[in-house]
Amino acid sequence: MTYSLTEKKRIRKDFATRSSILEVPYLLSLQKESFKEFLQKDKKPLERDPIGLHSAFSSVFPIHGVAGTADLEYVSYTMGQPEFDVKECKQRGVTYSSPLRVKMRLVLFDKDAPAGKRPVKDVKEQEVYLGDVPLMTENGTFVINGTERVIVTQLHRSPGVIFDSDKGKSHSSGKVLFNARIIPYRGSWLDFEFDHNDCVFVRIDRRRKLPVSIIFRAMGYSSEEILDTFFDHTHISYKKGAFVMQLVPSQLKGQTAAFDIADGDKVIIKAGKKITARNIKQLQEAKVDSVVVPEEYLLGKVLSSGITNEETGELVARSNEVIASDLIETMKSIKDLSFRILFIDDLENGSYISDTLNLDTTTSQLEAQIEIYRMMRPGEPPTKESSEALFNSLFFDEARYDLSSVGRMKLNRRLGRKDNEGSLVLENQDVVDVVKELLNIRNGLSTIDDIDTLGNRRIRAVGEMAENAFRVGLVRVERAVKERLNQAETDGLLPQDLINAKPVSAAIKEFFGSSQLSQFMDQVNPLSEVTHKRRVSALGPGGLTRERAGFEVRDVHPTHYGRVCPIETPEGPNIGLINTLAIYAKTNKYGFLETPYRKVIDGQVTEEVEYVSAIDEAQFVIAQASAAMDSDNKLLDELVTARHKNETILASSQDIDYMDVSPKQIVSVAASLIPFLEHDDANRALMGSNMQRQAVPTLRADKPLVGTGIEKTVAIDSGVTVIALRGGEIVSSDSARIVVRANQEEIAEGETGVDIYNLIKYQRSNQNTCINQKPIVKAGDVVSRGDVLADGPSTDLGELAIGQNMRIAFMPWNGYNFEDSILVSERVVQEDRYTTIHIEELTCLARDTKLGPEEVTSDIPNVGEAALSRLDESGIVYVGAEVKQGDILVGKVTPKGETQLTPEEKLLRAIFGEKASDVKDTSLRVSKGVEGTVIDVQVFTREGVKKDARALAIQEDELQKVRKDIDEQYKILEEDTIDRIQPMLIGQKLVDGTEITADFLASQDSSKWFGLNVADDALSSHLESLEKQLVAKKEELNGVFEEKKKKLTQGDDLQPGVSKMVKVYVAVKRRIQPGDKMAGRHGNKGVISRICPVEDMPYDETGRPVDICLNPLGVPSRMNVGQILETHLGLAAEGLGAKINAMLEQQADIKELKSFLHKIYNETQGQKVDFDSLTDAEIIELAGNLRKGVPMASPVFDGASEDEIKALLRLADLPESGQMKLYDGISGEEFDRPVTVGYMYYLKLNHLVDDKMHARSTGPYSLVTQQPLGGKAQFGGQRFGEMEVWALEAYGAAFTLQEMLTVKSDDLNGRTRMYKNIVDGNEYMEPGIPESFSVLRKEIRALGIDIELEQE
């Protein structure tokens, strides 16, 4: 295996028994691919596929004028360049988007020609601006109004047909009623349902129900056609004074004979006997094809067609009429009588449709359509045209109804049709087949569907949702255009006069800005970003609501396997509604989730990988990834555990169709980061997955000693690290930028040979954590494409590192770890292991007020020198200033209205000309509880307002940075070109005969080499072209600089009424302290109870104290044993690191070092490492990085076994039990039994006590009830609730209770009086009537009951 530059520096010992068949796919591909399809930016306008924006336009256009004299057609669209890049958009608080321009064609027809044959009179084409479309950043997010947002993928009910039942809950009898529902992508829902009398009804859009025959009549079927469609028939004729029935063998089986069936005199089947297959055979052998039936047999049978007396033309009986005794008499009198009855039995052919027809009062197509019109639009008078138009538009009009290709595929597959394609609207046959299938289910011939299977729920990603939002906007435009098209010709209008872009841009803005699925990105650490982008929500528009979702929808379903993670979902009301994609899952063209499997043929496992959706999976037999195989990949066991039809079975190895590609296939990214996940209880694993997302990036990231091997993938795919775009050599590397000279073969035509990576320094994330990048390469390193050049937040050498490795002991310590509390050593604080940086953004706006503009200035009235000492002459704080609560960051004064002056003030004014009292101090101050360093200031000034000195200085700084980048690029290009021409020139001759040598070139200025007069013409022209290239490049780079300069020097687009905006960023250092929440990766969370001096902590025989003491009682009841295994393996990892460290200290021989590494990596189970492929220097560097511990990877469901952990503990000369003697730091005595000690990866979560501590004296009150507000954000109080009142009542503390409910709460006068009394030093209170009592009185009066308070 070849290792990249960063991988060589630190190789993980991997315990996986199987090498990976399939690499983990790019984790953000779902988001990025979806949006790429929506825009189709890289395709030429006329070659675009009918998806995304193109599809939205094609479905709305062309728009036809009402009068038919003009059409507006869509031709194509183009996307412009965004005005600002992502970084500038975040700074300025604008949306990262690019303008959408659409080419429209207005076609005018000749008015005077007859309709339908109108010749084209004129065609006008024009590009129309249709608003800005937000663009996706490199990392799958959107910048909307300066903040990064994620559009969460939705899981919604797939269009198609679903058969279900009410599980016997609808009717009091408990009878199970079946129903069918045809769900389109957009349009009216069509429901069919049985009632308790076994009649079939139809509902449109969940309105009032109608008999199902009405919809067939409306589609043009007569009663007889309806009966023909749904029933089999039996022919009966009247001959020689008897009724003769034709026998149909298929109708006889299983029936009970109502009379003797005989061949001549020989009785074959006796009356009352059940007819068997043998009886039918006997009848066929005897060639009995008809039988005389007694008259009473016909009583109660139903006619399938009407009976007419041919002689008189009289209608004797209608179709669907029940045969009664008087009808039989009439029938006997008809000559040559022959008729059909419906074949109905109690087994498999119910009379449901026949019974339903009896309820139907309509007799013709028009009546049925009018009935439907009345139901859809009650109160409106129906006409023939309107009712016909409404019915056709409901299901048969492409503009109103769209089944979509998914819906058509699902419908056809469910109805057992061969073809998956077809019309995108409903057809008559579809409705008939759905009702037939519903009848089959009622007759017990078919089964209902499972609604919660992933075969009936599909994924709607960003692109599709944006397309729908866009289509909504276009439909709004369409209405306006239709009306304007009439006057298009008379007024000589152009396409842009017809189209108003506002509705479209409003729809897009609304979707990206305030849709339920457009969420503020969770950016605590790289994992939370990745997980947020891979989230799948069942909520949102067109989805479920929390209140209505039952248990079934939320539950884990067998089809989740490999598609949706069964572990990672939030606790609380959203449990099961918000899920996360499994690590290998992807969507197919229909939007259903698929998971990869290896193909298995006759027990031989192949390398071929196929993606299978939940719809197809049930029919296959699928083995686990852990099934035993020999070296030739043949399944060893005769019987293999497998999954088939959503059940786990034991199957013969010959019957296996597929096999999982990886053991971690079933879990999500976060869950696959938990080592020994297989030993944890699911509830705790859920908490572990969720808490990893809340881990705050520490000052120095520390890779986990025990990981799972997927850390690298997450760090790289999250986009927080810097990845080499092309291979090459590092020219320079410092904390702010890395410059790479690209390899010659990787430079494409017209590209520069230089890559400059500007690193992000101390930027604020959405959650106020710190985003900072640090280089991990040095000048002279040779890198390849895809190598990690710089670490981001929470990454260490290109691996995800969200916590710290802590030495942990599982033991109680003086009660300080009661109930999951955590005892932490002071050393952890001293070493800043959990110190985190949080960045607060504080904004100051200078507005134009009625009394004049506000002004940012350092001249603030009534403020001392000390308070202004940190401000520059513009009134803005210096970068680097240490500030604390209440300090001024931006000085600002606001004009205040003229007030009546006292005589003294008038005198002072007259003497000193004092105007200071005209303004009040509205400076931006440091908010409560914030103390830190100012790390950045940005000043934005409105166009036309003069920039202050500070703004100009910031602008100058920015320009210098850009200039430096551009100069560096040019310098490297120039050096490269000169390096290339030097060998060409040496040995050549000048025109005057001088030979060019290395010394000659050294004596010349290298920039003059191009102008050398060489004798060789070809070389001369080559030199000339190279010089031209350089000059052109220089001009291009200068153009880039001028563009940037223009952006920086122009005014900023601020919100209305704001003339200046100053943003100040304050970095706050938070050390760990009691009250902070910490957790491991196994759901083992707790709160720090005490920071204990190092000397008091328990220590081992070598005198090494532990860092953290955890309560051993936190393990058994929670069943998360993974943490114990992690602790043991962590101990081995650290012990091996200590041995390597000792070898390096003693400068051991490189062979000895290699052999020890070989023992660690290659003599236990897992993936082998070839140390011979590394140079000695690389081995030394690797060993140097392993001093603090050998990092291990224990992949989920394929991790280290107990024996392997023991073997590594032995190798590290540590006790195999993982337990050791500890001594009490306070008394020095040995504890009475060995204690489990080891290394666990521990995280500090974003629930810091500093953000939660809060106390109120007086503060804001609620408007209506006048009670104090609640919550820290409102500076609220603690609620004294119902139960607390009971407690005081129980104690009989009457006066305390009285003050709680009156003066401390909502007795207005009482509380002001008391406050005044306390100020006066008079501690006396007189309670009055609480305001909430008055509110109650008012509410009672609102009910019309007068209530008065009478004074006694």
From Swiss-Prot:
One of its GO terms (biological process) is DNA-templated transcription. Keywords: DNA-directed RNA polymerase, Nucleotidyltransferase, Transcription, Transferase. The keyword Nucleotidyltransferase applies. InterPro entries: DNA-dir_RNA_pol_bsu_ext_1_sf (IPR042107), DNA-dir_RNA_pol_bsu_external_1 (IPR019462), DNA-dir_RNA_pol_su2 (IPR015712), DNA-dir_RNAP_su2_dom (IPR007120), DNA-dir_RNAP_su2_hyb_sf (IPR037033), RNA_pol_bsu_bac (IPR010243), RNA_pol_bsu_CS (IPR007121), RNA_pol_bsu_protrusion (IPR007644). Its EC number is 2.7.7.6. One of its GO terms (cellular component) is DNA-directed RNA polymerase complex. Pfam families: RNA_pol_Rpb2_1, RNA_pol_Rpb2_2, RNA_pol_Rpb2_3, RNA_pol_Rpb2_45, RNA_pol_Rpb2_6, RNA_pol_Rpb2_7. GO terms for molecular function: DNA binding; DNA-directed RNA polymerase activity; ribonucleoside binding. It catalyses: RNA(n) + a ribonucleoside 5'-triphosphate = RNA(n+1) + diphosphate. Belongs to the RNA polymerase beta chain family. The RNAP catalytic core consists of 2 alpha, 1 beta, 1 beta' and 1 omega subunit. When a sigma factor is associated with the core the holoenzyme is formed, which can initiate transcription. HAMAP family: RNApol_bact_RpoB (MF_01321). DNA-dependent RNA polymerase catalyzes the transcription of DNA into RNA using the four ribonucleoside triphosphates as substrates. This is DNA-directed RNA polymerase subunit beta. It comes from Hydrogenovibrio crunogenus (strain DSM 25203 / XCL-2). The gene is rpoB.
